[in-house]
From Swiss-Prot:
Record region (N-terminal SAM-like domain): 4-129
UniProt xrefs under HAMAP family: Anamorsin
Protein species of origin: Drosophila sechellia (Fruit fly)
Binding residues annotated for [2Fe-2S] cluster, in chain numbering: 172, 181, 184, 186
Subcellular location: Cytoplasm; Mitochondrion intermembrane space
Residue span of region Fe-S binding site A: 172-186
The protein, known as: Anamorsin homolog
Gene name in the database record: CIAPIN1
Length: 248
């Protein structure tokens, strides 16, 4: 009991009254404080206030559901000491630990000890979270007027805006160029011949008024572009195959 020196108030729970006074005097000498007595069979009827004792000693007793009550009776960091206990030490230590005690250990073959945590049952403590960075809130105050934005129109060149010529899209599967091979069987030779005839017909078409590109509202009745949408001056326009051909 050398570890109990300086404990002011203790509770001794006894079973056998033989030599009881002697054991109480020994406990007083070890602690240097006052010692209260309680019979193990009267413990459930007792009405001790919470945090009343610095030390509780139990001798030759087997408690079942009283360890939680003893935990409330002890002050924070109070000690529990079992002497000449009844039952397996491992089972008792597990039961004491599940009741809320800490540092549960077997001091000797006939003695067990445990402690109450250094805080009162049901108490709360304020958690210390990391402080908010005041500079982080200033990020939202940054003005976006100083940022340079990219003009979308500058991303494209004039060549990128031009539509691809459909005449140059299809190539021969054999030569890899827009030129039919000798024994063309994919239809590219016929397509190139049709484009050639259409180009000749377009070149032969002459505009006497100079308004063909403006649309049908400005075209004459014999205009080869009649029925076609307006186009830009100088833009290549492909005429239908039946234009400039006699209907008879």
């Amino acid at each position: 009991m050398e570890n109990f020196k300086g404990l002011q108030k203790s509770l001794y729970i006894w079973t056998d009254s033989a030599d009881l006074d002697k054991r109480v005097e020994q406990l007083k000498a070890a602690t240097g404080g006052d010692v209260a007595l309680e019979n193990v069979h009267r413990l459930s009827f007792s009405s001790y206030a919470n945090s009343s004792f610095d030390l509780i000693v139990i001798e030759c007793a087997q408690l079942t559901d009283s360890y939680v009550k003893l935990l409330h009776m002890l002050k924070p960091s109070g000690k529990l000491h079992l002497v000449s206990f009844i039952g397996p030490a491992a089972s008792l230590l597990q039961e004491i630990k599940l009741s809320g005690f800490i540092n549960c250990r077997e001091d000797s073959p006939d003695a067990l000890s445990a402690e109450k945590p250094g805080y009162e049952t049901g108490s709360s403590a304020r958690l210390s979270f990391a402080k908010k960075n005041a500079n982080a809130a200033n990020v939202w105050k940054i003005s976006g007027d100083d940022e340079e934005l990219i003009d979308e129109e500058e991303l494209l060149d004039e060549e990128d805006k031009q539509k691809p010529d459909p005449a140059g899209l299809r190539v021969c599967s054999t030569t890899g160029k827009r030129k039919a091979c000798k024994n063309c069987s994919c239809g590219l030779a016929e397509e190139l011949e049709t484009e050639k005839q259409s180009q000749k017909a377009t070149e032969n078409a002459k505009s006497s008024c100079g308004n063909c590109y403006l649309g049908d509202a400005f075209r004459c009745s014999t205009c080869p572009y009649l029925g076609m949408p307006a186009f830009k001056p100088g833009e290549k326009v492909q005429l239908a195959d039946n234009l400039l051909k006699s209907d008879i």
